[in-house]
């Protein structure tokens, strides 16, 4: 591609530097996806591309990485979004942990007979969600609910106003709170 000839600023890790609108250090040049080095996930690249297109069109938008879900597609699935306990400890951010076995979801039990699972939520002192981690099927399908709560900074009381259909595995988040 000849990117090295454009004089693009790089990060300490050697990735192409971008701002919140996916603009590089060279005017009129935008970057998204793996070469920016943020999450290396297809779903992140799609969102980065949307932000870049919005910037080109003059629409207000900004890339946020605080709620990018990650999924391990095993059986059972593992999914997480937001911070982990380790990252919160390193950042010195106070938090509380709520753990709830997936067996609290009747739908999970019916669809995963004899299988265990766990839902772990990490909450800030202001009752907003900092991170969520799920072990059990369909973790990949329900983790987005937690990501939305993180991105929108929903408090526990706001989260509890949401009506979840019953029975669904996703209502495990509401049960945990």
Outline where the language-model segments fall.
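Flexible, glycine-rich terminal cap/loop adjacent to redox cofactors
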Residues: 57, 74-84, 89-177
